[in-house]
From Swiss-Prot:
GO molecular function annotations of the record: actin filament binding; ATP binding; calmodulin binding; microfilament motor activity
Domain Myosin N-terminal SH3-like: 33-82
Domain remark text: The rodlike tail sequence is highly repetitive, showing cycles of a 28-residue repeat pattern composed of 4 heptapeptides, characteristic for alpha-helical coiled coils.
Alphabetized UniProt keyword annotations: Actin-binding, ATP-binding, Calmodulin-binding, Coiled coil, Cytoplasm, Methylation, Motor protein, Muscle protein, Myosin, Nucleotide-binding, Thick filament
Residue ranges, annotated region (Disordered): 1917-1938
GO cellular component: a single term: muscle myosin complex
Coiled coil: 843-1938
Biological role: Fast twitching myosin mediating the high-velocity and low-tension contractions of specific striated muscles.
Subcellular location: Cytoplasm, Myofibril
Organism this protein belongs to: Homo sapiens
Protein name: Myosin-13
One Pfam family cited in the UniProt record for this chain: Myosin_tail_1
InterPro entries xrefs: Kinesin_motor_dom_sf, Myh13_MYSc, Myosin_head_motor_dom-like, Myosin_N, Myosin_S1_N, Myosin_tail, P-loop_NTPase, XRCC4-like_C
Main location: cytoplasm
Length: 1938
């Protein structure tokens, strides 16, 4: 794990990659109980953390973090990993590996935004749904060249490892990024490409930019390919805003040195259906919305489009904007990518034009010609735009769409298309254009990325659409999910199967582990023969196959036979599903609608021909190789069977072929897996759904991958490679002189290295390693290389320096020689002979010079001749050179052409290799098919023999059938006559069903479809014959003898099918037609009768609805009148209270009117019920009729389809019979269809009428319910109003009484405050004096402590001087010895050192003298301070006497307090009762007013709802009128309607009379209000009497409280006495604390001295050792001094041992004393803090409480002081207990010391200690009892405080209620608030005083006795403590003296 400094290279990404070092250390040091910490299963969170409490048999009780106790089985509890494994980077390293550990590790890392985690051999990444700074350039640089274990987990680390493996292993690599849709695969793919483009750049830049050429570097183009492909291939889905709707496999090729060479992209299965259709929460491809973002306005003008996506239906069926995508910025990125990738401007414009044309295709509209099935264009403007953009003639394009040319036989005919067919054709063309353009762009990108540079290896990056489960899953989802299934199987096979198989193949001991991850069943269900794809392709071969036939074949073949194929359960609100597949990631429901068309992918070949002739080059190029019906034949003649086979390929076949190529590529590489996870479905950052993540982990095999990584050996190396690479670790293990094979060498090498034997295994050809060991070997190799390189560098540097040194020596010798010669010359230069020599020597050289001139002339002549020869030679050579250069150029041209040919040959070779792979796959498929055909052939031979036997019998049956045909013809004539009669009856009904002709036409089309089906069956037979002929031709090549038998078999099969079908058809069709005719006649009669009845009922309902409408209008008018009255009531309510009576009267009138209105509507409700019963009866009859008709129609259709299918098969032999029966069948079917349309029309009209009736009935019921609610509310309002008035009067009377009482209380309050202030002043003066004395005492003690510390410091300084002196003496001794040994050489140095030592000695002596003088002065100051302490103690005693006088005054004050408290209780009881009554009355008043306002609001809402109902009823009446117009027989029921109308008029008149009666009721309400007023007055008088009674009760309660207060006064006096005693004890304890502090200081001082001595002795010991070593070397010289030093050394050792013993003892004493002092100090500070806190609380209470309650507060404070004094005494006892325990420990230590020093005192001290032990034990027992009793008292006090808090909460609730009253009762606000405040204060004070008095009485009595006993015991303990202290001092003094 790297440190924070090493992580600095990652920049700001460091905290997102690895935990900081501090956090890791804290995690390791965190407390952790491995036996209790666990994970447990939980229903909500799946797994939660907990602590094991107990284990019982097989059950475990666990407490979770949210304090839940769970009882679980053992298998539901999982142990937790230690904290150091929190957020671990590789989950394979965890101690406990299970699901919750993996889940929580991922969750905690995700919470810290560490999204990458290793999981064994692969990496897991969680989508953060936010931007993280972990992909910056500095992060790329940081990961470059790093090993996996050296850097945190990251996609860059995976990429770099793949890159390094490619270079070292010389093998192709692949990175498989898998996961569900929205997991982040596309982003990680882009990061991988970014990494490779950064680290493996070639550095070559393009020098110039030309159109159509590369416009950027290779790495730029690789990176920019992503934005372009994402714009045209990515879209928003439900789970992902940028989902890849195609798969891609990006191969990045590298050269031999690892430099980037080229790249190419393979794409798979673009989802082209998204071009024309999107779900509501999705959108189409990004490019459409980027263009419409108007970032490039010139594109809008060029493409003739608008910026509103809703103008184009193809791209606006779902959402049109995505919050996380800026379409305008993405358009710029896409446009820039097109430029960088080298597209020419013409190609760029072509791309945009085709994209715009696809958008215009969605706007093309067509309509149906009048009286024809033919479609025609509905406007040509859109077609003109599309034609302009695509370079087409729009008229020809429209003609080709509406009337395409179709080949029939050898001729072409024009086929008519209906609107739906033309629309489908347009959509198919748009999808085809977009798909081909996308594939062309991929091809162009690959051309640009192919740099023709030499390439050695490649790394493939796979990014394919993730597993998808939508509400509507089609063929695209099946292909995507099948791809993911194959990839998951590849992962499982690679990780689990191949890995373990290789172990066995290599001979490693291994038990095969079945991880249960085999997905073969699902894969075989989809792709194997007779699988889903196989059945789909088989159905596509038949021209008229349907989705239903495809579904039936699937069910027949797989339902119930394969566990992975299921029948889906119908779900409400979801799309229909036809079958379900159980995939590894879940069960998916698939809808097969349109699969056959999608798979065949048919196009309008007429329009495609126009595309091929388009003036837009790009469009014509895209469709130039299209192989349709026209080109198929011609192509077939040219290239034979190959062209024909290629044109027959379906979409699924192409997809499977591409998928097989992909899997072949992946198997040829070394894969690296990255598993992407979705944390939640809501795209929320930082949130993790446990169930969702766990499902993905289980499906992806993460846990199994970790397990096999831990158990297996994931790393392996060939023996030769291992020997070559790691021999450097121990070269001596492999002998040099002899041959040894690689395996033995590797074994010897590994055995010689310090590596665990369990971490590796030896196979047959490789050595296998556990995870992490190979990295360890790499580190060891790196370390070895470092050492070897260092030694090599040292040898080289040494050699170079020796060479340099040799040269330097040679130069030095030369210099010496030159210097010697010059010196010699200088010496002889002035000699006379030398002068003569200088003069003669030049003369001697002149003769020699002449000789030299002669020789030079000769040489000059020779050189001249040679020059001439060389010139001639040069010219010859120049001529040769020119010719050679010409030859060289020719050779270079030849070499260049040869290299080009070689490159072409290599490309052809590569193409041949690829084609070879494809051909091998095809050969494999053909061999499989051949085997299947052979099996089928053998089966057919057997069937042929059986058919030969049956042939003879069938011939006999044919003769019988001919006889039956004659009978059938006779019966046919009879049925024709019956049909004529039926047609005459049907003409009578044609007038009533004129509007249903469209449905009739559709049924006729269905009839036409059945005829087409017959033709399809014929085509199928012909197709089967052709296929059979092909198979026979193939089998002829293998077995020629079977050819004749196959022909016979085909003939027999056809004869059999025709005969059997003819027999069934002729029998069943005749019987069915007769039965159908009779049933139809009967049903027609019934339907006519029911239709007439239904028409009459509808007319009745229409009349009723008109009447209802009139009534509603009248009621609405009346409601408006009531509204006006309510508004008048609102205005009157705002005025004076005198108008209340009028308002009540009006409300009463309204209530009476509403009651009468509700009574009137009851008659209407009864009538509605009658009509509803009639409607229900009619509905049941109609439903029964429709059900019967539908059943008969279904049976007719089914039987007809069967007969048609069977007739089609026997069309050759029974053609004449078939034609006659077809005519009869078509006529009967037309009649049946007409009848079905009539019945459906009737059912629709009936359902409409029923809906209108139901809505009217619901509206009337709602009006009635609302009327009843209104009357009830009015009644309640009147009752509340009456109660409110009575309460108002009572409150006013009571308020007056309370005001008088308040005035009396204020007067008494003023008198009390004056007395209280005087007492306060006295108390403050006394407390100030007492505090001043205490402060003086504390300051004196503090001064004493300071002086003591100064004394100790002086003592330490003195000790330091002594040590310095001893050190100086030792140095003098050393110098003396050295002086004696080196007297001659260092005489001067020793003298100087001696002088320095003398100076230092003198300084040391002066320091000792000054220290002694300071010690004397300190002793004097100590004595003076002791005198001052004694004076302060006397002052303290005087302050105690002053406190006693103050207590007397306080007792007098308590008496006055009791008197006033009695008065307080009386007033409190009265006010409390008054407050309760006023509060209840005010709440009732507020409720009444709120209810009144709600009633008014409801009236208003009723008015609005009535208006809405009126509008709805008017709409309903309009609908009923329309239905009435369509029905012609309404006049029959007019009389009934008129009668009902008269009844309704009578009911309306009754309603008006009831409303008038309501007005009279309002008058009666006024009288009742006056009576309510009188009753309120009477209730006020009763309340006054109740108040008087409450006053008397409160007086009695006050008397009882007075008696309680007297008892409290007595107890307070007792507490005062106890307080005095406690204060005395406290003083004694403080004195003891001072003694203990001084003793502690003395022990500390003693410890410091001992430590100083120890240091001195240690220094002496070191010096002695050094001197001993010197003396040993000079033993002969200083033998006498050596003896002296040895004696000194022995003395020092003895002293050292003594000081060591004393040091240990003193350290133990110091620890005990410091513990004791610390306890005493903490207890003392806690007591002081509690005392201060209590005093602050008392002061705060005195400030907050009103002046009238001051005396009671003083009493409370006295009680609290008594409690605190008792607690202080108990704490002092506990303190003494602790000191005694410490003294006992100190005693044990002192015993050991005393044994060594004085054996005589052993027995005496032991006896004393035993006696002390017994007393201490007694004291401890008693103290424990006291502590328990104090705990009980504290609990009671806590309960009392809870009660007080409870009352305070009640008071808060009262204040809240008072605030509400303040809003509602303005006139009573001030008075009620004052009363409430006073009552609250009085009540709280009385309750607190009463509770505290009761508790204090009982507690003080108990504590008093206990404290007396505790005081006695404390005296005994104190005497014992003093004795022990005296003994300890004696012992300490004795040790000091020794």
């Amino acid at each position: 794990m790297s440190s924070d400094a090493e992580m600095a290279i990652f920049g700001e990404a460091a905290p997102y990659l690895r935990k900081p070092e501090k956090e890791r250390i804290e995690a390791q040091n965190r407390p952790f109980d491995s036996k209790k910490a666990c994970f447990v299963a939980d229903n909500k969170e799946m797994y939660v953390k907990g602590m094991i409490q107990t284990r019982e048999n097989d059950k475990v009780i666990v407490k979770t973090l949210d304090d839940r106790m769970l009882t679980l089985n053992n298998d539901q509890v999982f142990p937790m990993n230690p904290p150091k494994f929190d957020k671990i980077e590789d989950m394979a390293m965890m101690t406990h590996l299970h699901e919750p550990a993996v889940l929580y590790n991922l969750k905690e890392r995700y919470a810290a935004w560490m999204i990458y985690t290793y999981s064994g051999l692969f990496c897991v990444t969680v989508n953060p749904y936010k931007w993280l700074p972990v992909y910056k350039p500095e992060v790329v640089a940081a990961y470059r060249g790093k090993k996996r274990q050296e850097a945190p987990p990251h996609i860059f680390s995976i990429s770099d490892n793949a890159y390094q493996f490619m270079l070292t292993d010389r093998d192709n690599q692949s990175i498989l990024i898998t996961g569900e849709s929205g997991a982040g695969k596309t982003v990680n793919t882009k990061r991988v490409i970014q990494y490779f483009a950064t680290i493996a750049v070639t550095g070559d830049k393009k020098k110039e930019t030309q159109p159509g050429k590369m416009q950027g570097t290779l790495e730029d183009q690789i990176i920019q390919a992503n934005p372009l492909l994402e714009a045209f291939g990515n879209a928003k889905t439900v789970r992902n805003d940028n989902s890849s709707r195609f798969g891609k496999f990006i191969r990045i090729h590298f050269g031999a040195t690892g430099k980037l060479a080229s790249a190419d992209i393979e794409t798979y299965l673009l989802e082209k259906s998204r071009v024309t259709f999107q779900l509501s929460s999705e959108r189409s491809y990004h490019i459409f919305y980027q263009i419409m973002s108007n970032k490039k306005p010139e594109l809008i003008d060029l493409l003739l489009i608008s910026t509103n996506p809703f103008d184009f239906p193809f791209v606006s069926q779902g959402e049109v904007t995505v919050a996380s995508i800026d379409d305008s910025e993405e358009l710029l990125a896409t446009d820039n990518a097109i430029d960088i990738l080298g597209f020419s401007s013409e190609e760029k414009v072509g791309i945009y034009k085709l994209t715009g044309a696809v958008m215009h295709y969605g706007n093309m509209k067509f309509k149906q010609k009048q009286r024809e099935e033919q479609a025609e264009p509905d406007g040509t403007e859109v077609a003109d735009k599309a034609g302009y953009l695509m370079g087409l003639n729009s008229a020809e394009m429209l003609k080709g769409l509406c009337c395409p040319r179709v080949k029939v036989g050898n001729e072409y005919v024009t086929k008519g298309q209906n609107v739906q067919q033309v629309t489908n054709s347009v959509g198919a063309l748009a999808k085809a254009v977009y798909e081909k353009m996308f594939l062309w762009m991929v091809t162009r990108i690959n051309q640009q990325l192919d740099t023709k540079q030499p390439r050695q290896y490649f790394i493939g990056v796979l990014d394919i659409a993730g597993f998808e489960i939508f509400d509507f899953n089609s063929l695209e989802q099946l292909c995507i999910n099948f791809t993911n299934e194959k990839l998951q199987q590849f992962f499982n096979h690679h990780m689990f199967v191949l890995e373990q198989e290789e172990y066995k193949k290599e001979g490693i001991e291994w038990e095969f582990i079945d991880f249960g991850m085999d997905l073969a069943a699902c894969i075989e269900l989809i792709e194997k023969p007779m699988g889903i794809f196989s059945i789909l392709e088989e159905e596509c071969m038949f021209p008229k196959a349907t989705d239903t036939s495809f579904k039936n074949k699937l069910y027949d073949q797989h339902l119930g036979k394969s566990n992975n194929f299921q029948k889906p359960k119908p779900a409400k609100g979801k799309a229909e599903a036809h079958f379900s597949l159980v995939h590894y990631a879940g069960t998916v429901d698939y809808n097969i609608a349109g699969w056959l068309d999608k798979n065949k992918d048919p196009l309008n070949e007429t329009v495609v021909g126009l595309y091929q002739k388009s003036s837009l080059k790009l469009l014509s190029f895209l469709f130039s190789n299209y192989a349709g019906a026209e080109t198929g034949d011609s192509g077939g003649s040219k290239k034979g069977g190959k062209k024909k086979g290629s044109s027959f390929q379906t979409v699924s076949a192409v997809f499977r072929e591409n998928l097989n190529k992909l899997m072949t590529n992946l198997r040829s590489t070394h894969p690296h897996f990255v598993r992407c996870l979705i944390p939640n479905e809501t795209k929320t950052p930082g949130v993790m759904d446990h169930y969702l993540v766990m499902h993905q982990l289980r499906c992806n095999g993460v846990l199994e991958g970790i397990r096999i990584c831990r158990k297996g050996f994931p790393s392996r190396i060939l023996y030769a490679d291992f020997k070559q690479r790691y021999r450097i670790l121990n070269a001596s293990a492999i002998p040099e002189g002899q041959f040894i094979d690689s395996k033995n060498a590797s074994e010897k090498l590994l055995n010689s290295i310090d590596v665990d034997r369990e971490q590796f295994r030896f196979g047959n050809t490789k050595v296998f390693f556990k995870a992490g060991l190979l990295g360890l070997l790499e580190e060891m190799r790196d370390e070895k290389l470092v050492t070897l390189m260092t030694s090599t560098q040292a040898v080289c540097r040494g050699y170079l320096m020796r060479v340099e040194f040799k040269k330097m020596m040679e130069r030095r010798d030369s210099i010496f020689c030159i210097q010697y010669n010059i010196r010699s010359f200088m010496n002889v230069k002035h000699w006379p002979w030398m002068n003569l020599f200088f003069k003669i020597k030049p003369l001697l050289k002149s003769a020699e010079a002449e000789k030299e001139m002669a020789t030079m002339k000769e040489d000059f002549e020779r050189t001249k001749e040679e020059l001439a020869r060389s010139e001639a030679r040069r010219k010859e050579l120049e001529e040769k050179m020119v010719s050679l250069l010409q030859e060289k150029n020719d050779l270079q041209l030849q070499v260049q052409s040869e290299t080009e040919n070689l490159m072409d040959a290599e490309e052809r070779c590569e193409g041949l290799i690829k084609s070879k792979i494809l051909l091998e796959a095809k050969v494999k498929e053909l061999t499989e098919r051949l085997e299947e055909e052979e099996e089928m052939n053998s089966e057919l031979v057997a069937k042929k023999r059986n058919l030969e036997d049956k042939c003879s019998s069938l011939k006999r049956d044919i003769d019988d059938l001919e006889l039956t045909l004659t009978k059938v013809e006779k019966e046919k004539h009879a049925t024709e006559n019956k049909v004529k009669n039926l047609s005459e009856e049907m003409t009578a009904l044609e007038e009533n069903i004129s509007k249903l002709t469209k449905e009739k036409k559709s049924l006729q089309e269905a009839h036409q479809q059945t005829l087409d089906d017959l033709q399809v069956e014929e085509d199928k037979v012909n197709g089967l014959i052709k296929i059979n002929a092909k198979l026979e031709q193939q089998t002829d090549d293998l077995e020629g003898s079977l050819e004749q038998e196959k022909k016979l078999r085909a003939d027999l099969e056809r004869a059999k099918r025709k005969l059997e079908g003819d027999l069934k058809m002729s029998q069943e069709s005749i019987m069915d037609l007769e039965n159908d005719k009779q049933q139809i006649e009967e049903k027609l009669k019934k339907k006519e009768f029911e239709l007439s009845q239904l028409q009459a009922k509808i007319d009745d309902e229409q009349v009723h609805s008109l009447q209802f409408q009139k009534k509603i209008k009248e009621l609405q008018a009346r409601i408006e009148e009531l509204e006006e009255e309510i508004e008048a009531e609102h205005t009157l309510r705002a005025k004076i209270e005198k108008q209340r009576s009028d308002l009540a009267r009006e409300l009463e009138e309204i209530s009476e009117r509403l009651e009468e209105a509700s009574g009137a509507t009851s008659a209407q409700i009864e009538m509605n019920k009658k009509r509803e019963a009639e409607f229900q009866k009619m509905r049941r009859d109609l439903e029964e009729a429709t059900l019967q008709h539908e059943a008969t129609a279904a049976t007719l259709r089914k039987k007809q389809a069967d007969s048609v299918a069977e007739l089609g098969e026997q069309i050759d032999n029974l053609q004449r019979v078939k034609q006659k029966l077809e005519k009869e069948k078509s006529e009967l079917k037309m009649e049946i269809d007409d009848m079905a349309s009539n019945i459906e029309a009737l059912s629709k009209s009936k359902s409409n009428i029923e809906r209108t009736c139901r809505t009217v009935e619901d509206q009337f019921s709602e009006i009635k319910a609302k009327d009843e609610q209104q009357t009830q509310l009015i009644h309640d309002l009147n009752m509340q109003k009456a109660r409110l008035q009575t309460q108002n009067g009572e409150l006013s009377h009571r308020v007056e009484e309370k005001e008088s009482l308040i005035s009396q209380l204020t007067k008494s309050k003023q008198a009390l405050t004056q007395q209280l202030e005087e007492l306060k002043r006295q108390m403050e003066e006394e407390t100030k004096a007492k505090n001043a004395m205490a402060h003086a005492l504390q300051s004196s003690r503090h001064d004493c402590d300071l002086l003591r510390e100064q004394y100790e410091e002086e003592q330490e300084a003195k000790a330091e001087l002594q040590r310095a002196l001893s050190k100086a003496n030792s140095e003098v001794a050393q110098w003396r010895t050295k002086y004696e040994t080196d007297a001659i050489q260092r005489t001067e140095e020793l003298e100087e050192a001696k002088k320095k030592l003398a100076q230092r000695l003198q300084e040391a002596e002066e320091n000792t003298e000054t220290a002694n003088s300071k010690c004397a002065s300190l002793e004097k100051t100590k004595q003076r301070l002791q005198g001052e302490v004694e004076d302060l103690m006397r002052d303290l005693e005087r302050s105690h006497t002053a406190c006693a006088t103050l207590d007397k005054k306080q007792r007098n004050f308590d008496k006055v307090l009791a008197e006033w408290k009695q008065k307080l209780d009386e007033s409190q009881a009265e006010l409390e009762a008054a407050q309760k009554e006023s509060r209840s009355l005010s709440t009732e008043l507020f409720k009444m007013r709120n209810a009144y306002e709600e009633v008014v609001d409801q009236l208003e809402t009723l008015r609005r709802e009535n208006k809405n109902l009126q509008e709805e009823i008017s709409d309903l009446t309009e609908q009923i009128a329309e239905t009435g117009k369509n029905l012609q027989e309404a006049e029959k029921t007019k009389k009934l309607v008129e009668q009902e109308k008269s009844d309704l008029q009578v009911a309306l008149e009754e309603v008006e009379g009831s409303l008038e009666h309501e007005e009279s009721k309002i008058l009666r309400v006024q009288l009742e209000l006056s009576q309510v007023k009188s009753e309120l007055d009477r209730k006020v008088i009763e309340k006054d009497e109740e108040i008087e009674q409450l006053k008397r009760n409160s007086q009695r309660a006050a008397e009882a409280l007075q008696s309680v207060l007297d008892a409290e006064i007595r107890s307070r006096n007792d507490a005062l006495r106890l307080k005095k005693k406690m204060e005395g004890d406290l003083n004694e304890m403080e004195i003891q604390l001072g003694h203990s502090n001084r003793q502690m200081a003395e022990t500390q001082k003693h410890l410091r001295t001992v430590q100083g001595q120890l240091k001195d002795s240690q220094l002496h010991l070191d010096d002695a050792l050094r001197s001993n070593e010197d003396l040993k070397e000079q033993l002969a010289i200083v033998e006498r001094r050596n003896g002296l030093l040895l004696e000194e050394l022995e003395e020092m050792k003895v002293a050292l041992e003594q000081t060591e013993r004393t040091r240990r003892l003193s350290e133990q004493e110091l620890l005990d004393a410091s513990d004791r002092v610390q306890l005493l100090h903490s207890q003392n500070t806690s007591l002081i803090n509690t005392k201060k806190k209590l005093e602050a609380d008392i002061a705060q209470c005195q400030a907050e409480v009103e002046n009238s309650i001051q005396e009671s507060r003083n009493a409370e404070e006295k009680a609290k002081k008594a409690i605190t004094d008792a607690a202080m005494m108990a704490e002092e006892l506990k303190k003494e207990q602790d000191t005694s325990a410490h003294l006992e420990r100190m005693k044990k230590n002192l015993e050991q010391t005393v044994k060594d020093l004085q054996h005589r005192l052993d027995e005496a001290e032991q006896l004393a200690l035993k006696g002390g032990k017994k007393q201490i034990q007694k004291l401890e027992n008693r103290v424990r009892e006291l502590e328990n009793e104090l705990d009980v008292e504290q609990k009671r006090g806590a309960e009392a405080l809870k009660g007080a808090h409870k009352y305070e909460r009640k008071v808060k609730e009262m204040t809240y209620q008072a605030e509400e009253d303040h809003k509602n009762i303005l006139r009573l606000q001030d008075l009620v608030d004052k009363l409430q405040a006073k009552v609250k204060s009085y009540k709280r004070q009385a309750e607190e005083a009463e509770e505290q008095a009761n508790t204090q009485l009982s507690r003080c009595r108990r504590v008093q006795h206990e404290l007396e006993e505790a005081a006695e015991r404390a005296d005994i303990a104190e005497s014992q403590v003093n004795k022990l202290r005296a003994k300890s001092r004696d012992v300490g003094s004795q040790k000091m003296e020794e």
